[in-house]
Amino acid sequence: MAIQLTRRGALSLLLFLTPAVMPTWYAGSGYYPDESYNEVYAEEVPQTPILDYKVPRWCYTLNIQDGEATCYSPRGGNYHSSLGTRCELSCDRGFRLIGRRSVQCLPSRRWSGTAYCRQMRCHALPFITSGTYTCTNGVLLDSRCDYSCSSGYHLEGDRSRICMEDGRWSGGEPVCVDIDPPKIRCPHSREKMAEPEKLTARVYWDPPVVKDSADGTITRLTLRGPEPGSHFPEGEHVIRYTAYDRAYNRASCKFIVKVQVRRCPTLKPPLHGYLTCTSAGDNYGATCEYHCDGGYERQGTSSRVCQSSRQWSGSPPVCVPMKINVNVNSAAGLLDQFYEKRRLLIISAPDPSNRYYKMQISMLQQSTCGLDLRHVTIIELVGQPPQEVGRIREHQLSANIIEELRQFQHLTRSYFNMVLIDKQGIDRERYMEPVTPEEIFTFIDDYLLSNEELIQRREQRDICD
């Protein structure tokens, strides 16, 4: 039938149509014909190009950026990309080759491998504490980084590091060390006068001004000496402060506190007397009281005060022998003369021949020094009226005064009796028999002496020996 095609006719039609559906193929380009899903064609094996060693550009010309290709062709000369050519690849300084170091132009019109040059870099340097660095070319090859430290710090280690070809930095990482001591300024030295009646002065001051030249941190401030607001005794006192920073660097400063005491000339005790003074006895505000020994009384001011002008107030008194006035109207008037001045030992006996009386008077006459030292005056009441005698030393008492004394002190005429009266007029001890002066002195020393008298007794312990 006319509509049927023979097998031979059908094959001829397919061969005729094939060139119309095949795209252009560029030998050595590396590309292959595209397939079209809209067309159907007979599958064929690609044609193998004919090898020709004479073609000068069998493979594409090698061009490696930031590098160089050194090629050796079997043809020699200028054949750098002919079939069989072998090229050695290298990079410029500062670049590293990534890929094949050697490639060859293959029959497939391709090179046997790929490679490229990558710029060499070192890792970014870490920042150092209390310091910094500057680099000439960042992290690239041959870049030099110079280190520096903040004010107050010293660089220890490599001052510069260079980026080397192996991607490492030369040297080691330095450190910034705080070597500068803190700055410290103490307050000015000062001088102060002691207060009245005191030998010390309270002194205040502001704390020192301290600053660290590095990070500004002061870890410790120590004081050698009294604290501000303390009481300072007379003289010069050195106050020292020491400051420490974090690196244990230290700095010190000092100033002087001087305390002065206004003093008056040293007073001398009066003849037959002594002084008792407050405080140091010669400093501003001190008060000195004048006292007279037993048997003497003071004439003049009782005390003097050291003034701010460094002079004593008033004039010095004197101690004169005590005058006893027996021409008084009563026993009370007689005793008032001894109030706070003398102690009284009143002896009563029936008659001058009384054995106890004679024994007691004999012992007391041998101890007049001890009696005067303890401010003791003896009053004798001896005999019976109208021949009764009363006397104080050489002074005779009237009969009226004798009677009042007996009644006031409860002294009988019937037998020997004796009473010891203190400086306040109080009956302190009674005796019915003679006693030794040592017993009387012991009682007075143990119970009747004032603090001032105790001090004087210690100073005059051997005066009667």
From Swiss-Prot:
Signal peptide positions on this chain: 1-23
Gene Ontology MF terms in the entry: hepatocyte growth factor binding; identical protein binding; signaling receptor binding
Main location: secreted
Family annotation (SMART domains): CCP (SM00032)
Residue ranges annotated for the HYR domain, each copy included: 177-261
Post-translational modification comment from the UniProt entry: Contains chondroitin sulfate chains.
InterPro entries with a match to the protein in the record: DUF4174, HYR_dom, SRPX-like, Sushi/SCR/CCP_sf, Sushi_SCR_CCP_dom
One CC-aspect GO term: cytoplasm
Pfam families in UniProt: DUF4174 (PF13778), HYR (PF02494), Sushi (PF00084)
Subcellular locations according to the entry: Secreted; Cytoplasm; Cell surface; Synapse
Function per UniProt: Acts as a ligand for the urokinase plasminogen activator surface receptor. Plays a role in angiogenesis by inducing endothelial cell migration and the formation of vascular network (cords). Involved in cellular migration and adhesion. Increases the phosphorylation levels of FAK. Interacts with and increases the mitogenic activity of HGF. Promotes synapse formation.
Protein's UniProt name: Sushi repeat-containing protein SRPX2
Organism of provenance: Bos taurus
